[in-house]
UniProtKB/Swiss-Prot annotation:
GO CC annotations on file: connexin complex; myelin sheath
UniProt subcellular location: Cell membrane; Cell junction, Gap junction
Annotated region described as Disordered, given as residue ranges: 238-279
Membrane topology: Multi-pass membrane protein
A Gene Ontology BP annotation from the UniProt entry: cell-cell signaling
Cited function: One gap junction consists of a cluster of closely packed pairs of transmembrane channels, the connexons, through which materials of low MW diffuse from one cell to a neighboring cell.
PANTHER family: CONNEXIN, GAP JUNCTION GAMMA-3 PROTEIN
Top-level taxonomic group: Eukaryota
Molecular functions (GO terms): gap junction channel activity; identical protein binding
PROSITE patterns: CONNEXINS_1 (PS00407), CONNEXINS_2 (PS00408)
Protein name: Gap junction gamma-3 protein
Length: 279
């Protein structure tokens, strides 16, 4: 029973998405998580401890580091992943509710075969529940697109594309301009650009998924209208042909045939007396 329920849930999750949404977006999300977990702490774990300022003024180093990084890049990326995953989690919860509701409605899941087979057919034919799921999927893609774009803009505003090797600090309680140095700026720059590229690909593929969904829906609508018009023309032609056929008399015997043909028969024409006009 659990296996059938999971198959139905997975089928309902993937029936509205394209290969981009089924494969590329989850792979990029998993790659981002692995990259953060495996390399993030090693690259940015020492950013505060190795942040060296040329001063002995108490509190100056902490104030300069706060001015240089108001938000740690590692914490920013973790927050970004969680924030981007929220729309997908909400959509999965909505789909789970939809599947449970239909599961209880169908009793023992008799609609499983129809649901799985429906992935190969037209997915816009089902009723209002399927349409709500489709719009929920589009809404979560739109939310992810907005969140990814906002995160990319905020990342560029906070960190730019390159991690500098030194930073000139002018903050209290520092006396004048203080120069601070960072450890391994090149490694941090490479990781910063990598995370920027992964976020850019996620943004691009999310937009591509929306475009493919729109094109697919337009194609199915056009195909449905085309098939409907062909069916209407065929039905109209058949109706007219049937009407024309029904208007003709049904000939069953020779006498009925002779009555149906306008004028007289050949035998009656021979028996007609010859008048002066015929002579």
């Amino acid at each position: 029973m659990c296996g059938r329920f999971l198959r139905r849930l997975l089928a309902e999750e993937s029936r509205r998405s394209t290969p981009v949404g089924r494969l590329l977006l989850p792979v990029l999300l998993g790659f981002r998580l692995v990259l953060l977990a495996a390399s993030g702490p090693g690259v940015y774990g020492d950013e505060q401890s190795e942040f060296v300022c040329h001063t002995q003024q108490p509190g100056c180093k902490a104030a300069c580091f706060d001015a240089f990084h108001p938000l740690s890049p590692l914490r920013f990326w973790v927050f970004q992943v969680i924030l981007v995953a929220v729309p997908s989690a909400l959509y999965m919860g909505f789909t789970l509710y939809h599947v449970i509701w239909h599961w209880e409605l169908s009793g023992k899941g008799k609609e499983e075969e129809t649901l799985i087979q429906g992935r190969e057919g037209n997915t816009d034919v089902p009723g209002a529940g399927s349409l709500r799921l489709l719009w929920a999927y589009v809404a979560q893609l739109g939310a992810r697109l907005v969140l990814e774009g906002a995160a990319l803009g905020l990342q560029y505003h906070l960190y730019g594309f390159q991690m500098p090797s030194s930073f000139a600090c002018r903050r209290e309680p520092c006396l004048g301009s203080i120069t601070c140095n960072l450890s391994r700026p090149s490694e941090k720059t490479i990781f910063l650009k990598t995370m920027f590229g992964v976020s850019g690909f996620c943004l691009l593929f999310t937009f591509l998924e929306l475009v493919l969904l729109g094109l697919g829906r337009w194609w199915r609508t056009w195909k449905h209208k085309s098939s409907s018009s062909k069916y209407f023309l065929t039905s109209e032609s058949t109706r007219r042909h049937k009407k024309a056929t029904d208007s003709l008399p049904v000939v069953e015997t020779k006498e009925q045939f002779q009555e149906a043909v306008p004028g007289r028969s050949l035998a009656q024409e021979k028996q007609r007396p010859v008048g002066p006009r015929d002579a």
